[in-house]
């Protein structure tokens, strides 16, 4: 009986070991949570990774810089700060001001806020991207 129990125990350990190895080797779906996550994903999808990231300027750091745009990446809740930073970075670099906003868990209220931000930025001459939308477009193309 003890021998049979030892064999069963050994078999169970081997199965658990291989299950653990398989779980670690399985591809992981990347979940976007932080501003940096959205910044990197937007650069990769929209600019094919060619935008410069975190470029220092006087009194700040540009999230993404292209030949045309100085881009501030920001949560929709912090759009006020994002607009100010976009204008500042555009002046520092002689590029067009732009704001790339994201929403981690879209609600009706936040989508209404996005509409407001788009209108406000249009009146200020700031290009706006909704990162969630751009990532969804890229996902549908695949």
Predicted segments with their positions:
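Short Lys/Arg-rich cationic patches that frequently serve as NLS/NoLS or arginine-rich RNA/DNA-binding motifs
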Residues: 5, 24-25
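A short acidic, glycine/proline-enriched capping/turn motif at secondary-structure boundaries
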Residues: 105-107
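Bacterial N-terminal signal peptides
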Residues: 11-20
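Mid-chain, well-packed structural core segment of small domains
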Residues: 90-91, 95-103
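Short catalytic-loop micro-motif centered on adjacent basic/acidic residues
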Residues: 71-74, 99-101
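Bacterial N-terminal signal peptides that target proteins for export
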Residues: 2-12
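Active-site metal-binding core of divalent-cation-utilizing nuclease and nuclease-like domains
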Residues: 25-67, 76-84, 90-91, 109-127, ...
